[in-house]
């Protein structure tokens, strides 16, 4: 029973979601030549760091979690694990994860993990989430870190491919997160969390969602234009983006915003999974003949 509680406090669903993006970034950079020990070290290292961040987040948010229907039964809220024990647990997970990334992957992968962790725990969870409508924007940077870590674990450098991944996954986070805030509107309102739909209204949030999906669509195409991914990826990326944008535009005419937002959220997961799979299998080696190479 205790094992289940220690697992739950790490938010395994979030860990799994991040692993999909780590794998996408790693296999994109590997280009068919997979270093399996490096692959395992990277996956486990990122999983431990994400788990650590989630436990710290649970510790920090335990007061507002009590006010939200979705989170009122979390382990720390119910007192199934003490706050002091959770801090020790989170610290140990983080140390193990960072060590694995440093020694098993490379220092760059580790430092990217540190930056993502600091943004999520130190900037987003401790301050921005409670005090700023821009909390989601800041948090999106940490959400994009796993894909970039996976990529840089292979390359050992932050190149244009890593920058494109950072853009794709950061931009994806925004409509994904705003959709959650819309269908969980009352929860966020009750906890006084200043997310965009609560502060500016759902209509404004819909405008932002549409704009971010357009920006996301452009970013996804950059992988192919830069010569990092092939035409199969390009077709899937375009199809996913157009469909997601269509869903967003239909939001202006729906009768029930909550049902629409839940569907938009659900498709966001399908979208990022499809892109991660396609960049894993339809990779390319960039050369000087690509459009982006010519521009840059």
Swiss-Prot record:
Transmembrane segments: 10-28, 38-56, 79-97, 108-126, 198-216, 229-247, 269-287
Claim: Membrane is one of the keywords in the record: yes
Top enzyme class: transferase
GO molecular function: protoheme IX farnesyltransferase activity
Cytoplasmic topological intervals: 1-9, 57-78, 127-197, 248-268
Residues in the Periplasmic compartment per record: 29-37, 98-107, 217-228, 288-296
InterPro entries: Protohaem_IX_farnesylTrfase (IPR006369), UbiA_prenyltransferase (IPR000537), UbiA_prenylTrfase_CS (IPR030470), UbiA_sf (IPR044878)
Record-listed E.C. numbers: 2.5.1.141
The UniProt record lists the keyword Cell membrane: yes
Reaction catalysis annotation: heme b + (2E,6E)-farnesyl diphosphate + H2O = Fe(II)-heme o + diphosphate
Function field: Converts heme B (protoheme IX) to heme O by substitution of the vinyl group on carbon 2 of heme B porphyrin ring with a hydroxyethyl farnesyl side group.
Note: Carbon 2 of the heme B porphyrin ring is defined according to the Fischer nomenclature.
Family the entry assigns: Belongs to the UbiA prenyltransferase family. Protoheme IX farnesyltransferase subfamily.
Protein name (database record): Protoheme IX farnesyltransferase
